[in-house]
């Protein structure tokens, strides 16, 4: 009878789940206090007026209003603010 030796086992076959990072509310959108605006690793975006920063660097609205993205400062940092309507 024909025989075939067993193949070796592989050490691949793992992958981490996607973390669903990114901008959740874009410029000009209305948000309520507590709404998540951006989920990020590190501070790609910085918190501006009426925006809080969670311990995982998630930016969230502290007040109701419209989202405003702006670039300012000598290092051209990106700030996100909430402008009251």
Swiss-Prot record:
| Gene Ontology molecular-function annotations | structural constituent of ribosome
Q: Return the annotated region ranges for Disordered.
A: 1-20
Q: Which GO terms describe its biological process?
A: translation
Asked if the keyword Coiled coil belongs to this entry, the reply reads no
Task: Please give the InterPro entries that the UniProt record associates with this protein.
Answer: Ribosomal_bL27, Ribosomal_bL27_CS
Q: Give the record's keywords alphabetically.
A: Ribonucleoprotein, Ribosomal protein
> Which SUPFAM superfamilies does this UniProt record tie to the protein?
Ribosomal L27 protein-like
Provide one Gene Ontology cellular component: cytosolic large ribosomal subunit
- Pfam families in the record, alphabetically? Ribosomal_L27
Similarity annotation: Belongs to the bacterial ribosomal protein bL27 family.
The protein's name in its UniProt record: Large ribosomal subunit protein bL27
Gene name per UniProt: rpmA
Reading the lineage from the top rank, the first entry is: Bacteria
């Amino acid at each position: 009878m024909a025989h075939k030796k067993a193949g070796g086992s592989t050490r691949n076959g793992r992958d981490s789940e996607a973390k669903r990072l990114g901008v959740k509310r874009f410029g000009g959108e209305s948000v309520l206090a507590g709404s998540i605006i951006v989920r990020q690793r590190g501070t790609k975006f910085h918190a501006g007026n009426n925006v809080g920063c969670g311990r995982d660097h998630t930016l969230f609205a502290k007040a109701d209003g419209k989202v405003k993205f702006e670039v300012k400062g000598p290092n051209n940092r990106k700030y996100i603010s909430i402008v009251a309507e």
